[in-house]
Amino acid sequence: MLKLIRPAIVMIVVTTAVTGLAYPLAMTGIAQALFPHQANGSLVEKDGKVIGSSLIGQSFTADRYFHGRPSATTGADPNDATKTVAAPYNASNSMGSNLGPTSSSLMTRIKGDVATLQAQNPNAPVPIDLVTTSGSGLDPHISPEDAYFQIPRVAKARGLDEAKLRTIVDAAVEPRELGVFGEPVVNVLALNQALDASMTQ
């Protein structure tokens, strides 16, 4: 009986040691040696303090900043732990809204967002990305069109010339990966950092 069980036990121990200990430690070591910034979360610092990550979006709401896409993430209700409340860009609870195209709640929210955005820039069509959530609710990027659409609002709030602001957005556009994969994007946190930096020059 023991002869039959022993190979199975040895296999379990070896497999656990290799896949549960050796492999993770090896990958962690390689990542820390070759890509320490990425391995530690691609954190963004300002004046020695972490202000975010280039991989996770955050909620910018002030008119003087560019805004990201809507986020459907939720968090615990501080008044009732058994319930949840809206908590945009909650990195501990990545999720979409799960609302389908026939959802009245989704349509009401989108119509409200469209009306708000049209009031800010009545001379341009509202980009669809600015009224739709990403699958994770944590998308750190917007399309260049999303950023250009927001220029009038940000320029007015900061008292900046729109042409100067467009130059800042142009510089923040990240091209396709290897010139082929994906679409050009703008990292919202990086753009807002560049915007703040331009005000001190």
Curated annotation (Swiss-Prot):
GO MF term (any one): P-type potassium transmembrane transporter activity
Keywords noted in UniProt: ATP-binding, Cell inner membrane, Cell membrane, Ion transport, Membrane, Nucleotide-binding, Potassium, Potassium transport, Transmembrane, Transmembrane helix, Transport
Superkingdom as given in the UniProt entry: Bacteria
Cellular component aspect of the GO annotation: plasma membrane
HAMAP family per the UniProt record, alphabetical: KdpC
Function: Part of the high-affinity ATP-driven potassium transport (or Kdp) system, which catalyzes the hydrolysis of ATP coupled with the electrogenic transport of potassium into the cytoplasm. This subunit acts as a catalytic chaperone that increases the ATP-binding affinity of the ATP-hydrolyzing subunit KdpB by the formation of a transient KdpB/KdpC/ATP ternary complex.
Alphabetical list of PANTHER family matching this protein: POTASSIUM-TRANSPORTING ATPASE C CHAIN, POTASSIUM-TRANSPORTING ATPASE KDPC SUBUNIT
Protein family according to the UniProt entry: Belongs to the KdpC family.
Quaternary structure note: The system is composed of three essential subunits: KdpA, KdpB and KdpC.
Name of the featured protein: Potassium-transporting ATPase KdpC subunit
Originating organism: Rhizobium rhizogenes (strain K84 / ATCC BAA-868)
